[in-house]
UniProtKB/Swiss-Prot annotation:
Principal place of residence: secreted
Catalytic residue list: 147
Species: Lachesis muta rhombeata
Keyword presence, Membrane: no
Oligomer status and interactors: Homodimer; disulfide-linked.
Protein name: Zinc metalloproteinase-disintegrin-like lachestatin-2
GO molecular function terms noted in the UniProt entry: metal ion binding; metalloendopeptidase activity; toxin activity
Residues carrying sugar: 312
Length: 421
């Protein structure tokens, strides 16, 4: 499972924000500023390609009337304000994995940017800020890639770290001879972070219609107007795709996909993905597409010896969730512990409405915070919870989990499995 996760292609769905000073700096021209922002993201994507990460610009915002936070020369304060704005405003209206602020302000000291370490996929911490410190856009792009590197678990390079160039992306200071290369240390740190945190948001491939930047033929991502994208003509190894035009070669039906074989669609009924478990179904090709559409058993079908019900292709049960939070010996706490969810306090609640925590109704207590008993001699507390103010949703009972016979959790309520949920 771990190796499968590490090998999977990762996608960072990025929103890039430019502040009011940037708007003034580029002559109040939205076109000029947008072009600079697109150029920066294209370079960032090139840099991260070597790490098997595609950076897709899914949102671009320019504060052309006034700043939405108080941008100031203290980078620490500005980062905190920007991250808070992202969590409370931007995330509510635009789905994305990471946000970066490009600012025209001059930060105190030698700082050109700042970001939270290992913040990717975390609502409060997947953010960075970068000063537009140089006319040359690729130097600003390297600075932003550096900050995103922090978000992806990479720390500053030490003297012993090497990448085959004079300076690597995660160098502690700006270099006049920067490179697009990550050091051996950065690669190790990124891998260790992926193993430890296994951030899920970066596994989700954006739709081509989600991308707001102009299509770039040769960036390995099929965008609007393209039929395929196998990289540059020099690097493309795909016989189905014309690298110069990002169009399929004559006679080819497809270039990639589980239902594509030697540039042709596989026959209808060909199995393209085996069933993973009892809540999944074997997926079949249609004969009309290269895609292998994921199918699964209907929600509410009993699974794991009637301990759970299928939900969107998985079988969520409380014991598995306790093990994921507290280790292999963990078990679900006694029913009395779940009564804490009646309180509606900072951790014991069923759901949030407009940022207000709603206490559980008595029949719904098993659809709020999860209570576990970690079976270790050191732990005497029978009602252990996982609660972090930075990620309050972690440690809640997962949607679709069995909460009573014939019932499953949906939006903090224990509902009948015969009704849609």
């Amino acid at each position: 499972e771990q190796q499968k996760y590490l090998n999977a292609k990762k996608y960072v769905k990025l929103v890039l924000v430019a502040d009011y000073i940037m708007y003034l700096k580029y002559g109040r021209s939205l076109t000029t500023l947008r072009t600079r922002m697109y150029d920066i993201v294209n370079i960032i994507n090139l840099i991260f390609q070597r790490m098997n990460i595609h950076v897709a610009l899914v949102g671009l915002e320019i504060w052309s009337n006034r700043d939405k936070i108080i941008v100031q020369s203290s980078a620490d304060v500005t980062l905190d304000l920007f991250a808070k704005w992202r969590e409370t405003d931007l995330l509510k209206r635009k789905s994305h994995d990471n946000a970066q602020l490009l600012t025209g302000i001059n930060f105190n000291g030698p700082t050109a940017g700042l970001a939270y370490l290992s913040g990717i996929c975390k609502p409060m911490y997947s953010a960075g800020i970068v000063q537009d410190h140089n006319k040359v856009h690729h130097l600003v792009a390297i600075a932003m890639a550096h900050e995103m590197g922090h978000n992806l678990g990479m720390d500053h390079d030490k003297d012993t770290c090497t990448c085959g160039a004079r300076s690597c992306v995660m160098a502690g200071t700006l270099s006049c001879e920067p490179s697009y290369l990550f050091s051996d240390c950065s690669r190790r740190e990124h891998r260790a972070f992926l193993i430890k945190d296994m951030p899920q948001c970066i596994l989700e491939k954006p739709l081509r219609t989600d991308v707001v930047s102009p299509p770039v033929c040769g960036n390995y991502f099929v965008e609007v107007g393209e039929e395929c994208d196998c990289g540059s003509p020099a690097t493309c190894r795909d016989t189905c795709c014309d690298a110069a035009t990002c169009k399929l070669r004559q006679g080819a039906q497809c270039a990639e996909g589980l239902c594509c074989d030697q540039c042709r669609f596989k026959g209808a009924g060909t199995e393209c993905r085996a069933a993973k478990d009892e809540c999944d179904m074997a997926d079949l090709c249609t004969g009309r597409s290269a895609e292998c559409t994921d199918r699964f058993q209907r929600n509410g079908q009993p699974c794991q010896n009637n301990n759970g019900y299928c939900y969107n292709g998985t079988c969520p049960i409380m014991r598995d969730q306790c093990i994921a939070l507290f280790g292999p010996n963990a078990a679900v706490s006694q029913d009395a512990c779940f009564q804490f969810n009646l309180q509606g306090n900072h951790y014991g609640y069923c759901r949030k409405e407009q940022n207000t925590k709603i206490a559980c109704e008595p029949q719904d207590v098993k659809c709020g915070r999860l209570y576990c008993f970690p079976s270790s001699p050191a732990t005497k507390n029978p009602c252990n919870i996982h609660y972090s103010p930075n990620d309050e949703d972690k440690g809640m009972v997962l949607p679709g989990t069995k909460c009573a016979d014939g019932k499953a959790c949906s939006n903090g309520r224990c509902v009948d499995v015969t009704t849609p949920y």
